[in-house]
Each structure stands twice: as structure tokens, then as C-alpha cells.
């Protein structure tokens, strides 16, 4: 009998920010296939005999290819197991959850998706930065800081984005290029506020604030490194001004 795969969003970092439904799924799972960026504390809730499989991806470390991860999910489900695919943030926000669902559908494997709190909103929020604020920002855009190398053409052009707030995920290692693009946007200037939030919502959270004119230098000086979220726009300082 075929099992089932549940994609669970683990939230932005703090283990207490997972949903009740997500935690319940972990407790019931026969197999937990987990990413690098999830809080390892969540694995303590798995059954004693549950199989825990690490499939993390991180620059500079061994990375599992998406095809390998897909294969694990399919094989374990075909063994009749209840499989939890535990992902940082939300499975469908730059989490490649859609690709995994398509693979499961190809093999007629039942699946469920349990949303998670995305780091795109929660990380700035916990750092005191709202992504929208009345009279300051009425729109926000979330983009990836590095696009897939196999894309035929670039889809994100920061020089043309008109949202009041731009949230960039996975962009710290590409910061210099991102800033160059943003400075070509008529809506931005060297004075536009920027924040880099590293390991957001956790006890190791660090925040670097600056402007498009000095953030690259500040990031180097303060040794900015992934994982992190970059926020661009007037909202960065809006709660500091009152």
C-alpha cells in the first residue's frame, strides 16, 4: 500500500513558530526528510523509531540535488510510509515544494501541504521592520537573490521593480550585484535604507542597517553571511523614528 507525503513548512527559524498542524505531522511521521535551515529542535518531536533523513543544501557544503530528494520521497512513500518533508519557511516560497509535488503526482502518491510562516515577512517583523506601513509602504515584493543557473534568461530585474518594499531571500552572497541593480532603479538612491537580517527569529539573530550607498561595506565589515533576509525601503527605519 502506498503511503503519503506531507510537505510541512517549519517556519522562519524559531522552532516555536511552526504551526500546530505541522508539529502534529512531525509527531506522526514514519520518515522525516529535512532541510538545512529548519530548527533541529523540531526533530526531537519525531517518534523514537522515525527515520530522519537530512537533505540540506547550503553553499560551500555538500548539497543534495533536487532529483535525489524527489527519489527519496517517492521511494519512502512507496514503502507505505507516512513521510514528512520538512522545509524552512513555507514550502511554496522559494522552497521548490511545487517541483516535489509534481514528482509525487507523476507517481500517483497522495500528498498534503501544511503552510509555514515565511521568513520573507516574519524575519523583518521580528527585527522590528514591517514590510508595509501606512503612508510609507503600501506594497512589497519578495524576490530571490540568486536565480537558477539553468534559466534561459533572467526573470528578476531589480532596476525595474516598483514596490515600496523589496524583500530579497538568499541574497547575501550576491549583495554587491544586487545593490548595483537597485541603484539603477529610479525609485531608489544611495540614501535608500537597507537592512540585512541574519539567522532571523533565532537567538543568534543579527541585524545590519545601512543604505544602498554603504551597505556593501558594512556587510563586509560585520561579516554578513547566510542565512539571511535583505529588506530595501523606507520601512527599514520606520519604527525607529518615533
Curated annotation (Swiss-Prot):
GO molecular function: uroporphyrin-III C-methyltransferase activity
Positions bound to S-adenosyl-L-homocysteine: 12, 88-90, 118-119, 170
Keyword terms: Cobalamin biosynthesis, Methyltransferase, Porphyrin biosynthesis, S-adenosyl-L-methionine, Transferase
Reactions catalysed, as given in the entry: uroporphyrinogen III + 2 S-adenosyl-L-methionine = precorrin-2 + 2 S-adenosyl-L-homocysteine + H(+)
Domain of life according to the entry: Archaea
Gene3D superfamilies referenced in this protein's UniProt entry, alphabetically: Cobalt-precorrin-4 Transmethylase, Domain 1 (3.40.1010.10), Methyltransferase, Cobalt-precorrin-4 Transmethylase, Domain 2 (3.30.950.10)
InterPro entries recorded: 4pyrrol_Mease (IPR000878), 4pyrrol_Methylase_sf (IPR035996), 4pyrrole_Mease_sub1 (IPR014777), 4pyrrole_Mease_sub2 (IPR014776), CobA/CysG_C (IPR006366), Siro_Cobalamin_biosynth (IPR050161), Uropor_MeTrfase_CS (IPR003043)
EC number: 2.1.1.107
GO biological process, one term: cobalamin biosynthetic process
Pathway(s) served: Cofactor biosynthesis; adenosylcobalamin biosynthesis; precorrin-2 from uroporphyrinogen III: step 1/1
General function of this protein: It is a step in the biosynthesis of both cobalamin (vitamin B12) and coenzyme F430.
Quaternary structure and interacting proteins, as annotated: Homodimer.
NCBIfam families cross-referenced by the UniProt entry: cobA_cysG_Cterm, PRK06136.1
Similarity annotation: Belongs to the precorrin methyltransferase family.
Protein name stated in the entry: Uroporphyrinogen-III C-methyltransferase
